[in-house]
Amino acid sequence: MNITTKTIQAQIAKGAFKPHTALTNIALAYYQNASNYFAKALFPVCRVPQSSDNYYVFNKEDLLRDGWDRKPAYGQTSPVPVSEHTETYACKVDQMIMGIDQIRQTDLERRQGPALARDPRQQRARTIAEQANIHQDKLFAKSFFHAGVWDNELTGVDSTTPGEKEFIKFTNANSDPIKFIADLKLSMQRETGRTPNKMGIGANVFNALRHHPAILERVKYGGATANPAQVTKNVLAQLFELDEIVVMLSIHNSAKMGADAEMEFIGDPDALLLVYAPDAPSVDEPSAGYIFAWDMLGDGNILPISHYDGAPGTHSEYIEGLMAYDMKKTADDLAIFCKGCV
């Protein structure tokens, strides 16, 4: 059959011809909401010019001691020392590479489709950045947000008479989360001179707090019929008298390539971490933790993404991402980890 433009138009009109193209205004891509990620929300990010180095730690006991004394006649008081020591960090380089098949890409470009399909470099760069967020959250959870990391660790129990280093789970109606957190804050203030200002909570903890009777009682008169009171992160932060509450909502697929998906929250959904940490690196403030980020190119970009061609004859090209972090616990006494909150 001799196919002409007119015959194709006639087949399209009859619905017999379906052109092999893709929609340009829709595609499905499970990129997560940026607000779900938590790795850089609790602890300050310190950009460093070397992959490893030292930093000073001044002795807490010396700084918080009263060094003043009554001056003796014709004499002087003894000089007061402030001791210090150094700790180290070491950023390890992680890498992600994605490929582009130029022959396959030719077909995709001719089929039209959305811009991301026609511009694979942009799509690969975005995917690398997205999975960098997932990787950073996994590093954070491994370094800071699980049992056995912090000296100050408490365990939730169903009993209304908790023992030492135990507390009543928030799913128990007899619990009082507001007083519990207030007591923890006061204990840290007594030991360090710093009151916790941030708290990271798992997804199930957030859900339990939002529906806890003691918290609902505090906010029930704050709304109206058209705009009922809601327990949000900001409301919880105000009730707990904290600068910020970070809800750990990011997820990842823990299954290997080719296996059935195993979706799960990255941060322990049943835990919380109460900390003191400044918003930015400081030379006269302590912090429970720091995220050291190596500026390997020296241009301020801590996630450099580059493009290069594949070997001759492969008709391929690659997009590469690099990053180097050390997520380090820097002050054990400025954090309290609570597991099994629900």
Where are these regions (language model features)?
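A binding-site-centric feature that preferentially detects glycan-recognition modules on secreted/surface proteins
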Residues: A117-T127, Q131-N133, R218-V219, N234, ...
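Assembly/oligomerization interface modules of large self-assembling protein complexes
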Residues: Q32-G99
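Protruding loop/beta-arch "assembly-hinge" segments enriched in small, turn-prone residues
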Residues: M1-A29, N33-A41, R47, N301-V342
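Extended oligomerization regions of viral-like shell subunits
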Residues: R194-I291
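Surface-exposed flexible segments
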Residues: L42-P49, R210-G222, P278-D309, D333-A335
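Intrinsically disordered, low-complexity coil segments
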Residues: Q11, Q105-P120, N152-E166, T171-S175, ...
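Oligomerization/assembly interface segments of phage tail-like spikes and tubes
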Residues: V93-I100, E317-M323
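Alpha-helical scaffold segments that mediate packing/assembly in large oligomeric complexes
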Residues: R104-T195, A203-Y221
